[in-house]
Amino acid sequence: MDKTQSRLRRARQTRIKIAELQVARLAVHRTNTHIYAQVFSPCGTKVLASASTLEAEVRAQLADKSGKGGNVAAATLIGKRIAEKAKAAGIESVAFDRSGFRYHGRVKALADAAREAGLKF
């Protein structure tokens, strides 16, 4: 089993447990250059809010700072944006789905920023 298969196996187990809880899910995906966050409905079929480093507003803000979307500063910005969008959609608490990635670095920065912005998990 390689690294990718191991990560996907961990992600699948997490999603099964979150589905049993029937709560909104904050899913995070990271690549070398970007980070993405989506809030899914409790049934898991609808995306209620999303934010990523590909958005034009985010890219403009990052151009002032570092110019890249694959760093902790970008993840912090995405965490704040996803929390604001989720709260605007009426979502106060979510289950955090790290998609099998380690809770470290950019994933942790996104989660901490979302918590500071008022999202509960």
Curated annotation (Swiss-Prot):
Which GO annotations describe the biological process of this protein? translation
The Gene Ontology CC terms held by the record are:
cytosolic large ribosomal subunit
Provide this UniProt record's keywords sorted from A to Z: Ribonucleoprotein, Ribosomal protein, RNA-binding, rRNA-binding
* InterPro entries per the UniProt record, alphabetical: Ribosomal_uL18_bac-type, Ribosomal_uL18_bac/euk
- UniProt-recorded Gene Ontology molecular function terms: 5S rRNA binding; structural constituent of ribosome
Family membership noted in the UniProt record: Belongs to the universal ribosomal protein uL18 family.
Q: Which NCBIfam families match?
A: L18_bact
Q: What does this protein do?
A: This is one of the proteins that bind and probably mediate the attachment of the 5S RNA into the large ribosomal subunit, where it forms part of the central protuberance.
Q: How does it assemble?
A: Part of the 50S ribosomal subunit; part of the 5S rRNA/L5/L18/L25 subcomplex. Contacts the 5S and 23S rRNAs.
Protein name per UniProt: Large ribosomal subunit protein uL18
